[in-house]
Design a protein with these regions (language model features):
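C-terminal accessory region of SF2 helicases/translocases
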Residues: 41-59, 63, 292-305, 641-916
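ATP-dependent helicase/translocase motor core
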Residues: 1-105, 112-123, 193, 497-500, ...
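SF2 helicase motor core recognition
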Residues: 164-167, 213-217, 547, 592, ...
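Conserved Helicase C-terminal RecA-like lobe
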Residues: 57-79, 95-98, 105, 118, ...
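SF2 helicase/translocase NTPase motor core
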Residues: 61-81, 88, 110-202, 231-271, ...
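Conserved SF2 helicase motif VI
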Residues: 624-645
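A short beta-strand element within the Helicase C-terminal
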Residues: 219-222, 608-621, 646-650
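Inter-lobe coupling linker of SF2 helicases/translocases
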Residues: 155, 159-173, 177, 181-185, ...
């Protein structure tokens, strides 16, 4: 009762007086007047077409109404219309949802857009400070933007998240956090994800990435979850996310089994894409070059500023004969990663490299109770208190599988990289043997969630120190002979034997038998002859391959003379040389022409302009196709057009059997989803169907979605808005239309649409067959009408639809109560007066935060651990370490209702087969 009474008093005190003895007569006179006007309006129903135009006008006018206090032109850049619109949309999204994902394709100026948004928010006094978090290699670039736009930002490396978090907690301010290359935070179960979430919690956020999806569509949601605690935390949307992820898993399974045709895969990918965009479009800015060319407004602006895009030619595949190495190639593949490696029958095959060194926990003894106790202790010590044997097995297998796949990728990259990896692995295996024999202990990886994209070289992050048992990133298994089964030592020796056999097979294979390199040489000479002024970039995943190619080309007198090769290395002097020779955005007086060929790893494919080059050679195909997108994006930039066409060349072996084509298959499958969801300008791997002839396969080895012509959902409506602004009479009529319009229309479903406008934006809801949808793309599609369509008065059933809409529109809370929530509720009651009023409010806010699903999984687990490992007031002290007290003011923002204090613009009732 007391809680309800206090709530009533609180709301009552907020109330405004609207009627008293002094204004009674005027008040009721106005009521009668408004009632008569309302009745007149209802008798004179507005057509659905005019309503549709009104919604379009209100939607785009709100964005355009955003007054910018500065633009890129104020800081030495051009004011492109598409960038100005993105800046306005970004500010709108940040004010409405506390964050925005800027995901324009590579080369359209995402960093400029983000910098301009940051400067405007500072000038508008919406934020007090800017923090930028980015990879080390682009810190210099961001320091330049920092200086140019005068935003006085604190710039932190992604590798120093702990420093960023410490700074945020020690210096309380209203901030904007800019996260560049946000795709690095797609795994929401990692320590770094937990860190970035804590840094951003309660702050405004701009996440930047051209490639927000790496492995699954859940990647996109993980990035958005860093800042969004409102839109996608709605239970309706949570359920939709679960459904989408399930559909994707089913599609992937059918793809692997070749149950679907290529056309079916693409069709289903597009369906999944539409569902995803229906959830996130309001907090993502994503345009392709085709969007800019499709929009007459953007196209004219680009033409006016004499800005053209490069035409990217169809990618060309260069398959090379393996010749005498063909049998050795296949035999080696079968040893390190057999085609049916997931088949359990392989477990006892002594001819297969298992990667035993990376998964010793699988061999923990479990025969006796004491064995199980000791083994369980080791598992918990390595992976945490919640870990069990199943988790340890899964994590161990993940790291072993990763290392085998890494070996395959290096094998497919170059003979040199592969031979070096085998030698390194043999050395590491021999080191482990010495540790076991001499000291009876074993160093083991603590990481089970290895990210394929984060590792390019061998496991050289293991740092073994002779005089210390402190291993960076490792745990030491002591008394190893007593805790590991004899099968471990047998399989370990077998792995070592296989590695030595492979080394022996390949040790006499040198550059003279490297068919891939000879194919490259042949093509390079041809490129140089055909394109005299066109510079070339060769990309590889691996530094060893880059070194090998650079040294081999330098030794070839003809190529060295023709191309003057440059190798990209990680130092500032080399980076300046690369920019001087390959960056067309530099002042002409700073540009040089000393080098015509650049050989680089993917570290250079992000954050650097290389558009003086017109040819890209992918010497190997990454496991993740977003890497290839980023490679191409380095030379396909907005601004100066140097070439009519850009060329992409991909190198792959000509396989004569269905052996290991996993990289290509996986890349094509993922690329279909990526392009379906986000659209892309360019084919980057293959021409349609060309892969089949290359691999001589009876079934398709890959799928590629030809989606270059896909455009963003709002381009069509933006065109209507622009035409409306050119018709003065119609525009004036639409502008003078009153709000609070309510009509009924015929359609193929039962439902209701509402469009509202509030302080921070135009938003809406669609209730269709008892399911809520907040996607404006879907709502606009429903509102779309022909000029001759008629309106009808709302039916008697409208009130029940409105009630259903109100009930469903803001369902935020979770469907279940986790242990942490139950324990906190009990704890609050038990502690009573032992904690202060402020501390009780703190606990209540954490409870609400859990109900609204705003904390990470790790935070929830840590709260549960606090209860498990502590008692009384110590529990509270531990919780305060987990959830920062001041950040919980963010709960007030979460609880706010978009629909509260908003104005109803339009409400349309839909019935199928209704009585007119």
């Amino acid at each position: 009762f007391n809680e309800l009474y206090n709530y009533f008093e609180e709301e009552w005190n907020k109330a405004h007086e609207i009627l008293n003895n002094k204004n009674e007569e005027e008040f009721f006179r106005n009521i009668i007047k408004l009632t008569n006007e309302d009745k007149k309006d209802k008798d004179d129903l507005v057509s659905p077409y005019k309503i549709f135009l009104k919604v379009i006008y209100e939607y785009f006018e709100f964005i355009n109404r955003e007054e910018l206090l500065c633009s890129p032109a104020d800081y030495g850049y051009r004011d492109y219309k598409y960038q100005i619109d993105a800046i306005k949309s970004g500010i709108n999204g940040i004010m409405l949802y506390n964050g925005v994902l800027i995901s324009d394709v590579v080369g359209l100026g995402k960093s400029i857009i983000a910098s301009a948004i940051a400067k405007n928010l500072l000038l508008k006094e919406k934020v007090e400070e800017i923090i930028i978090i980015c990879p080390p290699k682009i810190i210099d670039s961001w320091e330049n933007y920092n200086s140019e736009f005068q935003i006085k930002a604190k710039v932190f490396s992604i590798g120093l998240l702990d420093k960023a978090l410490e700074y945020v907690r020690n210096h309380r301010k209203n901030r904007l956090i800019i996260i560049d290359e946000a795709h690095r935070f797609v795994n929401n179960k990692t320590y770094s994800y937990d860190m970035i979430t804590n840094i951003c919690f309660g702050n405004k956020v701009i996440a930047i990435t051209a490639t927000p999806m790496h492995n699954t569509t859940s990647d996109i949601f993980s990035i958005i979850d860093i800042f969004d605690r409102k839109l996608t935390k709605n239970k309706n949307i949570e359920e939709a996310k679960i459904k989408i992820l399930k559909e994707e898993r089913e599609l992937k399974s059918k793809y692997k089994k070749s149950e679907n045709s290529k056309e079916e895969n693409i069709k289903k990918s597009k369906e999944i894409a539409k569902e995803i965009m229906s959830l996130i479009h309001t907090i993502i800015i994503r345009r392709t070059r085709n969007d800019l060319l499709e929009s007459s407004e953007y196209r004219k602006d680009l033409e006016k500023q004499k800005t053209e895009f490069n035409d990217v030619e169809e990618p060309k595949l260069h398959d090379y004969e393996l010749g005498d190495l063909s049998k050795l190639y296949y035999d080696t593949l079968e040893k390190i990663s057999p085609y049916n490696e997931d088949n359990e029958d392989n477990k006892d095959n002594s001819n297969i490299f298992k990667g035993v060194r990376y998964k010793p926990l699988i061999y923990l003894k479990k025969k006796t109770i004491e064995d199980k106790r000791k083994s369980a202790e080791i598992v918990k010590e390595v992976y945490g208190e919640d870990a069990n044997f199943d988790f340890a097995d899964l994590s161990s297998n993940n790291i072993a599988k990763f290392m085998r796949h890494l070996l395959v990728r290096r094998f497919e990259s170059s003979i040199f990289a592969f031979k070096k990896s085998v030698e390194n692995m043999i050395g590491k295996y021999e080191n482990i043997k010495r540790f076991v024999r001499g000291r009876n202990y074993y160093p083991i990886y603590k990481r089970g969630d290895v990210n394929y994209e984060d590792y390019s070289d061998d496991d050289n992050d293991i740092m073994i120190k002779d005089n210390s048992k402190k291993y960076e990133g490792l745990y030491i298994i002591e008394n190893v002979k007593e805790v590991l089964s004899k099968e471990f030592f047998i399989d370990f020796e077998n792995d070592l034997k296989i590695l030595k056999e492979i080394k022996k097979y390949w040790e006499n294979i040198g550059i003279e038998k490297d068919k891939k390199f000879f194919k490259l040489k042949e093509e390079l000479k041809k490129f140089k002859k055909e394109n005299d002024k066109r510079k070339i970039i060769i990309f590889s995943e691996f530094k060893d391959t880059v070194d090998y190619l650079y040294e081999s080309i330098c030794k070839d007198e003809e190529l060295n003379y023709l191309l003057k090769p440059l190798k990209s290395v990680a130092d500032s002097k080399n980076r300046e040389t690369v920019k001087a020779n390959f960056d067309a955005s530099l002042e002409e007086r700073k540009q040089e022409s000393e080098y015509f060929l650049l050989i680089s790893t993917d570290t250079l494919s992000e954050g650097v302009n290389l558009h003086r080059a017109g040819i890209i050679i992918n010497y190997d195909i990454p496991y993740n196709p977003t890497r290839v997108i980023q490679r191409v994006g380095r030379i396909n930039r907005i601004g100066k057009k140097l070439f009519d066409k850009i060329y992409i060349h991909n190198f792959i072996p000509r396989l004569e059997a269905q052996k290991d084509i996993k990289n290509w298959q996986i890349s094509n499958f993922k690329l279909t989803l990526i392009n379906s969801i986000f659209g892309n300008d360019t084919k980057i791997l293959q021409k349609d169907d060309e892969i089949n002839s290359l691999f001589s396969l009876k079934r398709e080895a890959g799928i590629f979605s030809d989606l270059e012509n896909d455009i963003s959902w709002d381009i069509e409506y933006r065109e209507i808005y622009n035409k409306l602004n050119q018709d003065n009479n119609l525009l004036e009529e639409i502008k003078n239309m009153k709000d609070n319009i309510f009509i009924r229309r015929e359609n193929d479903f039962n439902g209701l649409v509402e469009i509202r406008k509030g302080e921070n934006g135009i938003f809406g809801g669609l209730l269709k067959n008892s399911v809520m949808d907040y996607n404006m793309a879907n709502i606009f599609k429903i509102l779309k009408a022909k000029e001759n369509e008629k309106s009808f008065k709302p039916s008697d059933k409208a009130e029940s639809l409105i009630a259903d809409f109100e009930r469903r529109k803001n369902i935020k809370k979770i469907n279940y109560k986790p242990d942490a929530l139950l324990k906190l509720e009990r704890y609050k009651e038990i502690m009573g007066l032992e904690i202060s009023l402020n501390d009780r409010e703190y606990i209540e806010k954490i409870i609400k935060g859990i109900e609204y699903n705003i904390f990470t999984e790790k935070q929830i687990k840590n709260i549960e651990k606090a209860f498990k490992n502590n008692n009384g007031i110590e529990i509270f002290k531990e919780i305060k370490k987990i959830i920062d007290y001041s950040s919980l003011n963010y709960i007030n923002y979460i609880e706010s209702d978009y629909f509260k204090d908003s104005i109803l613009v339009v409400r349309e009732e839909f019935f199928k087969n209704f009585d007119k």
